[in-house]
Amino acid sequence: MAPAADMTSLPLGVKVEDPPFGKPAGGGGGQTPSTTAATAAAMGADAEGAKPKVSPSLLPFSVEALMADHRKPGAKKSVLAASEGAQAAGGSAKPLGARPGSLAAPDAPSSPRPLGHFSVGGLLKLPEDALVKAESPEKPERTPWMQNPRFSPPPSRRLSPPACTLRKHKTNRKPRTPFTTAQLLALERKFRQKQYLSIAERAEFSSSLSLTETQVKIWFQNRRAKAKRLQEAELEKLKMAAKPMLPPATFGLSFPLGGPAAVAAPAGASLYGASGPFQRAALPVAPVGLYTAHVGYSMYHLT
C-alpha cells in the first residue's frame, strides 16, 4: 500500500499552469498539461528536423558584428568566416546591406553592374583601344547637350596680323627730281639772295641749271616752308630761355613795388588799408631789390 501512496503523490507535485489563451487546464479534451507540452515539443522537433540546419551567423554590417569587432580581437575573422558559410549554405543568397558583386563568391556568376566612364572601376575595365582613343589628339566625342550652340564655345578665330597701312600716293604723281650737288648749291645761293623770283628770273635761272621752271618753282616753295619752320623753332627756343624757372613772385621782381609812400609808412601801421573794406593787403617793401632776379636781368638797387 505504500507504493501506491507514493505514486499518487507524484502528480500532485507537478505545477499546473494556465494555457496562454485563458483556457482551463483540464478542458483540453481530457488531456493533462504534461501530455500537451510533450506533444508541442515533439511537433517543434519535427519542424526543426525538416528545415536545413544553418549555423547562426552575423551580418558583416549589422550592429552585433560592429560591436563584436570592438569587444574581441578575433571577431572580424569569425564574422568573415560566418558570412562565407552563410553564402555557401544559401547558394545565390547575398548578405543584406552589402553592394551587389562586392562580397559574392568568385565562382558564382553574377551580372556585373554597369560602371560609369569616370569611376575607378570604369577606368580599369576600359579596353586599351578606348584609352588610346581618349589620349589621341583627334576631336573628342561630345554629348548632345555639348553640341548645342548655346553651350558650346564659339570657334576660335585666327587673328591675321594687322597689315601695314602705307600712305597712298596719287596715281599720276610725278617722280621726285634728283638734284645734283652743283644744282643744290646754286639753288641755296640764289635763295639766300632772293626768296621770291620773278617769271623772267626763274626762266633764266632754270635754263642755267638745265632744269624746268616748274622744278625751280617747287624747290623754292619747299625751301620757303622749311625756312619758316626753322624760324618758328628758333623763336620757341628764345621764349623758353626767357621764361623763369620758378614763379617771379618768389625769386625776382620785374618792377619796383611800393613807392616812397610804402617806405615812409610807420612801423605800427596796419597791413590792411583803410580806404575800403575790399582793399588787398599791402606788405611793406624794402627799397633794395631782391638779389635773385629773372634770368637775363642783372642785380639792381632801388633809389
From Swiss-Prot:
It comes from the Eukaryota. PROSITE patterns: HOMEOBOX_1, HOMEOBOX_2. InterPro entries: HD, HD_metazoa, Homeobox_CS, Homeodomain-like_sf, Msh_Homeobox_Regulators. Residues 1-55, 74-113, 135-161 are annotated as: Disordered. The keyword Zinc does not apply. SUPFAM superfamilies: Homeodomain-like. The keyword Zinc does not apply. It is found in: Nucleus. Keywords: Developmental protein, DNA-binding, Homeobox, Isopeptide bond, Nucleus, Repressor, Transcription, Transcription regulation, Ubl conjugation. There is a cross-link at residues 15, 133 (Glycyl lysine isopeptide (Lys-Gly) (interchain with G-Cter in SUMO)). GO terms for biological process: embryonic morphogenesis; inner ear development; negative regulation of gene expression; negative regulation of odontoblast differentiation; nose development; positive regulation of cell cycle; positive regulation of odontogenesis; regulation of odontogenesis. Residues 32-47, 81-93 have a biased composition (Low complexity). One of its GO terms (cellular component) is nucleus. GO terms for molecular function: DNA-binding transcription factor activity, RNA polymerase II-specific; RNA polymerase II transcription regulatory region sequence-specific DNA binding; transcription cis-regulatory region binding. Sumoylated by PIAS1, desumoylated by SENP1. Sumoylation of Lys-15 and Lys-133 not required for interaction with H1-5, transcriptional repression, inhibition of myoblast differentiation, or binding to gene promoters. Belongs to the Msh homeobox family. Acts as a transcriptional repressor. Capable of transcription autoinactivation. Binds to the consensus sequence 5'-C/GTAAT-3' in downstream activin regulatory elements (DARE) in the gene promoter, thereby repressing the transcription of CGA/alpha-GSU and GNRHR. Represses transcription of myoblast differentiation factors. Binds to core enhancer regions in target gene promoters of myoblast differentiation factors with binding specificity facilitated by interaction with PIAS1. Interacts with CREBBP/CBP, TBP and SP1; interaction with these transcription activators may inhibit autoinactivation. Interacts (via C-terminus) with PIAS1 (via N-terminus); the interaction is required for the localization of both proteins to the nuclear periphery and specific binding of MSX1 to the core enhancer region in target gene promoters. Interacts with H1-5. This is Homeobox protein MSX-1. It comes from Bos taurus. The gene is MSX1.
